[in-house]
Amino acid sequence: MKLSRRHFMKANAVAAAAAVAGITIPIAVRAATEQSEAIHWDKAPCRFCGVGCGVLVGTQNGRIVASQGDPDAPVNRGLNCIKGYFLPKIMYGQDRLTQPLLRMRDGKFDKEGEFTPISWDKAFDIMAEKFKTALKEKGPNAIGMFGSGQSTIWEGYAAAKLFKAGFRSNNIDPNARHCMASAVVGFMRTFGMDEPMGCYDDIEQTDAFVLWGSNMAEMHPILWSRITDRRLSNSNVTVAVLSTYQHRSFELADNGMVFTPQTDLAILNYIANYIIQNNAVNEAFFTRHVNLRRGVTDIGYGLRPTHPLEKAAKNPGSDASEPMSFEEYKAFVADYTLEKTVAISGVPADQLEALAKLYADPKKKVISYWTMGFNQHTRGVWANNLVYNIHLLTGKISQPGCGPFSLTGQPSACGTAREVGTFAHRLPADMVVTNEKHRAIAEKLWQLPTGTIPEKIGLHAVAQDRALKDGTLNAYWVMCNNNMQAGPNINQERMPGWRDPRNFIVVSDPYPTVSALAADLILPTAMWVEKEGAYGNAERRTQFWRQQVKAPGESKSDLWQVVSFAKRFAVEEVWPEELLAQKPAYRGKTLYDVLFANDVTTRFPLSELAENQLNDESRDFGFYLQKGLFEEYAAFGRGHGHDLAPFDDYHKARGLRWPVVNGKETQWRYSEGHDPYVKAGEAYRFYGKPDGKAVIFALPYEPAAEAPDDEYDLWLSTGRVLEHWHTGSMTRRVPELHRAFPEAVLFIHPQDAKARDLRRGEKVRIISRRGEVVSVVETRGRNKPPRGLVYMPFFDAAQMTNVLTLDATDPLSKETDFKKCAVKLAKV
């Protein structure tokens, strides 16, 4: 194969990106564009993280043969991270599932049987039987679904509609509960609306970046490349990084701070105190646009009610607050002096003061970025609220180059889990099931009888595990996630419920993951561009793609699975007589007829698709299903700050940031001149709140649920690495990525290893109060924990890191704290 100069330059750009991960790109991949005349190219957002990079997908003879960064994509401008360059290979693992598999013995289902191929009809037969039995015997609370921030927008929408409207069960929750729930609740408490007010364009306009619990260099590398360019091109730009251990983002930091776990709360309050004491409050902004409230404290740790920590809490799970004056708030944060904060956090005084001065300087534009370090936190909502406090005190918000920005880890945690509302308490467009008016809006748009949607919040992710274990949740569908590996406290709280003979577990996945192998029925799913899809990224950018290849074997998209399953239920089987009496025309119909084949969702014919355009779902059902569902969903948000563009606009664009009003996207919300919902003369209006004012909360430092003691003498923090994504179910099937980081290791300070007679490369047993795992000692490399803390990634199915973790959650968001538990080490 010969390379032109142009292709040679492209290949070298790819190779340079790969070098960051220590990977050699095969010539065949580097030269993927060489035969571009024979390859068909089309756009799609990347399948991995929440950055939302645009890629060009090359197909040939019904297979994906190449991918490259999309030069017209505003997010990444033609650059991909190393995972993005290997996107084609995630589709073609040797163990790709192509048939439904049921545990069987002697020709029938057996919980202890062997996985046996069956037809889709038989798969849906037994699923329907198990769901109908649970509904009949125990009601809607006995069924549930655990979904995903990786599902497409219409997949999540269809699943939420089936459960909340069809089955009348709010027991549907996404794996975004484990990563973004604290951000959601934090946004809602402070602003009354979810998601960031700024966008990635802030990067090129700011003077300072502050990272709180976010290793962007590895977890959001494309954004990090833009930050790096901004920092190295402008000597006046500053980067501050705060974490419980040193990582690759520290390499660019002007001020890198390692703090004791959980004490970020104290640091945030110290900064607020510094701003007030040094007369750096933006009085004009603060007086006009901010309210103050004192939050309830001692709220527990989201453990089972019988746990001693929950029994001891004065206000378990309370999100109550009361108004307070500025003088009262000033007195509250005054307790967080520099000296006290140094003592609590372990960060040197000069570094803390430099950080506070950065925020306080009225001439400096500042962006705060955070990810799991804030969110996976037993006070994650508080951490989110406290960083908003700093930006609201200084007025550094909703303007180019200024603002707090919660980064997401999954490609559609925003677009699907949050905006669609696949959480157990949410409906589309920030509506909630507990609000009667919101339920009425949903019932009207969905053409349901009044009272169909239950008002009780469903089971969140960790509560689902507990209910399965307790035998109260009996029919359970897990879709597009690997929670048996990714969720907390596996042995004590998850595995028992999955293997309980009272329960029937279904897993939809393209690969035999740990979760799939623990299930009773596995449904093979289409991946990424094997279906038409849409994602929403961290900057409110909604992006579409078309189906580009067919899925292998009998694999079907999650959308097809949800909609097809609805055909198995007559309305009379799931709705009581009082609901049917309101809609007599629905008698004799199925949930498919009512929810997915009604006069709204079927109004776009197949003729809108090009003759040769792949769209397996629409051609199967006989109408443009994705468009019908999207336009129905979009009606929830149009006119009140969640406006989405018409469906067809997204196929033409490289994404649009909502609210999209009169064809124009919004870069910065809540500020005059940028947001169409802010009127002339208002300057700012936080219109999620009735009075248009954001809220500053007084919230204290409170300790972690579990900390080291004499026996379990080390903190354990868990997370990811550059080469692998989440549990590695896709990336570990890419040979190059697997070779680059083949197994998980335990990163430990050299002195901590020496004190335990452990050497680099030796096996080590990590033990918590919940279980133990054997890993390999690593005293060098990219992650450098301080003494007293160890770090372990969770991508390796052979080392089930989450056997160790505690199922403590933020009591307000119900998000798990994967960053803090106590362990001890033993030689193997």
Curated annotation (Swiss-Prot):
Residues 1-31 form the signal peptide. GO terms for biological process: cellular respiration; Mo-molybdopterin cofactor biosynthetic process; nitrate assimilation. Its cofactor is [4Fe-4S] cluster; Mo-bis(molybdopterin guanine dinucleotide). [4Fe-4S] cluster binds at C46, C49, C53, C81. Its EC number is 1.9.6.1. It holds the Pfam family Molybdopterin. GO terms for cellular component: membrane; nitrate reductase complex; periplasmic space. It is found in: Periplasm. GO terms for molecular function: 4 iron, 4 sulfur cluster binding; electron transfer activity; iron ion binding; molybdenum ion binding; molybdopterin cofactor binding; nitrate reductase (cytochrome) activity. It comes from the Bacteria. Keywords: 4Fe-4S, Electron transport, Iron, Iron-sulfur, Metal-binding, Molybdenum, Nitrate assimilation, Oxidoreductase, Periplasm, Signal, Transport. NCBIfam families: NAPA, PRK13532.1, TAT_signal_seq. Catalytic subunit of the periplasmic nitrate reductase complex NapAB. Receives electrons from NapB and catalyzes the reduction of nitrate to nitrite. Component of the periplasmic nitrate reductase NapAB complex composed of NapA and NapB. HAMAP family: Nitrate_reduct_NapA (MF_01630). This is Periplasmic nitrate reductase. It comes from Pectobacterium carotovorum subsp. carotovorum (strain PC1).
